[in-house]
Amino acid sequence: MNKTLALRTVVVSLLGTVMPDGAKTYYQQAQKDHPKIYAVYTLDLIDLTDGRYTYELEINVMDYGTDTSTIEDLADSIQKAFDKKVQLTEDVGVYFYIDRRNTVEEEDRSSLRRRLTFSTYLYER
């Protein structure tokens, strides 16, 4: 398995442990018929040094309405699931560390969005 696919598999697996029933996870862009609550993640390779691939993992969590408790709880769960997490698979070792968590203001005021970014270090095994 290539390293990017292996990393994406790890990310989807971790998100799957915290996403509520009926919520979806997308890579790069959500589908038009997405559910009310969903997450979109992206991976950007930012460095390669001595066999260590450094990625920035960005996870955007979306909800709709005026009550922010659901999206804040989900962002808390994602942060807990990823921060300082070590995942070892047959192909890669992956380490996650939180960099930033912030609210993103959307033009549509009924949209609620939280962005979490993680420094992600991948080693091929």
Predicted regions and their residues:
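Charged, amphipathic alpha-helical segments and their flanking helix caps
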Residues: M1-A23, T42-R125
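Short acidic low-complexity segments
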Residues: T25-D33
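A short, hydrophobic beta-strand-centered structural micro-motif
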Residues: H34-L43
